[in-house]
Amino acid sequence: MSWKTEEVESHIPVMLKEFLKHCSPKRDEQWIDGTFGYGGHTTALLDKGCKVLALDTDEDAQKRAEILKEKGEEFYFFRKNFSEMAEACFQMGWTAVDGILLDLGVSLGQLKDPKRGFSFQFPDAPLDMRMDRTRERTGAALLNTLSKEQLVQLFSVACNMKESQKLANEIVRFRSTGPIKKVGDFLEIVTRARLLKSKINAATRPFLALRIAVNEELEHLEKALREGTKLLKGGGRIAVISFHSAEDRIVKEFMRSHCLPKKGEGVAEEENHREMFFYKVERVLVSLEERKNNPRSRSARLRIAWKIPLEEKSGL
């Protein structure tokens, strides 16, 4: 039986081939898909015979999951952030899992929906940017209420210090004449800030920084890495697909700092106190073919870490 729905068939999951090749999910394994979205990675796991517990905060993702749940009993969905995976596993009675996948960032559906305010392609849209619309804080609310110093800190996640200061100054100037409400208001602020020219649209990095702040994405990622690692069985793997340097830096540092050194390598003094969870870490870049067929994937990178088997860990 194929688990794919019509909507999943039309969606292209990022780095799916690489994920399946390097993680090798097997029949009857228990997997967590922390970012269900359109269900592309989940259905691939189900087609391999895995049991899948999926999470997503988006109500549209929940509707897609309900359709998938009608197909069988190997799929379970929770409308929660992936940082709450331990709680979801507890509710399911899952004490440990074979694998975890996190496909970070905003989905194509969220970007294309004008009401969500994620894209600068829709200037008349409300500046919302919430992945979970039950949350109160919108992008507009943050820009209207944060202090100048807090705004500089917000934008420094994706912009350099000079650009962050320019943006903060223009936001304070703009809101002195009236509240920021629409995507177009933020675009006007970016234009006034006269950021340094680059190959990408000048609004790309400011929009990214604001979205990260609205959804507390980096905080949730750090918690998910800690909690997820505890849930992994010995030999289990955690795979994270990231799209920008702030995310990737967190994933890289977490996996590297908790991985056994390679043969012949020593351990830095500051790392002696850290518990080692992993015996192997890999980085996989997106293929040229996928970059050509799916431009959204051009900045994607996949990092995978394998947990130390219990028998090996007991001998450390």
UniProtKB/Swiss-Prot annotation:
Biological processes per GO annotation: rRNA base methylation
Location of the protein in the cell: Cytoplasm
GO molecular function terms noted in the UniProt entry: rRNA (cytosine-N4-)-methyltransferase activity
Reactions accelerated catalytically: cytidine(1402) in 16S rRNA + S-adenosyl-L-methionine = N(4)-methylcytidine(1402) in 16S rRNA + S-adenosyl-L-homocysteine + H(+)
InterPro entries tied to this protein: RsmH, SAM-dep_MeTrfase_MraW_recog, SAM-dependent_MTases_sf
Enzyme class name: transferase
Keyword presence, Methyltransferase: yes
Keywords: Cytoplasm, Methyltransferase, rRNA processing, S-adenosyl-L-methionine, Transferase
Chief place where the protein resides: cytoplasm
Family matches, as Pfam families: Methyltransf_5 (PF01795)
Domain of life: Bacteria
Keyword Methyltransferase recorded: yes
UniProt EC number: 2.1.1.199
Family assignment from sequence similarity: Belongs to the methyltransferase superfamily. RsmH family.
Its job: Specifically methylates the N4 position of cytidine in position 1402 (C1402) of 16S rRNA.
Protein name (record): Ribosomal RNA small subunit methyltransferase H
Phylogenetic placement of the source organism: Bacteria, Pseudomonadati, Verrucomicrobiota, Methylacidiphilae, Methylacidiphilales
